[in-house]
Amino acid sequence: MRGETRRHGREVKAVGMLSGGLDSILAARVMLEQDIHVTPVHVRTGLTYARRNRLAGREPSAPPAPQQAAQALGLELVTIDAFEAYIPVILDPQHGYGSAMNPCVDCRIFLLRQARQWMEEHDHDFIFTGEVLAQRPNSQMRPSLAVVERESGLEGRLLRP
C-alpha cells in the first residue's frame, strides 16, 4: 500500500520492523492508516526454529511469520540476510545476555542498524517497531530503549507506536 502523507513535498516512507507478531502487525496498520508508505523489513539472523527444522531435514509447513504478516497487510516483505554479521553479536554482546542467554539489547541494536542501512539506501524517512514499553524485562525498559535508539544511530528516527 502506498501512502499519501507528504513531507517537504514528497511521500513519507517508513521501514517497519516486521516480526510477524501481533505488535509489529498493529504498528504497521497504524502507519498505513496514517497514509504512510510502509515497507516491511525482516532481518534474518538464521537463528530460528525454521532454520533448525530445515537443517534437520524437515520441510516448513507454512511460510515464515513475517511473510504471512506482510501478505495479510497487502505488502511485499524485504528480507535482509544477516546471519554471518550476527555471529559476533551473540558470541560477545556488549550489553550482556538476557534471561534466556540471548543478547537482547545488542540484538535490537544490530537489527536496527541493518534496517537503518536499508532505510538510507532506499530513501525512507524513519523506522518503526512493535516494541512495547516494559513488555520484556531487559530490552524493552525505558533505559534500554534509549540505548538501542542511540547506538543504532536512529535518534529521532525510530518510532515505537
Regions found by a protein language model. Give the residues of each.
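ATP-dependent adenylation/nucleotidyltransferase module used to activate substrates
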Residues: 1-161
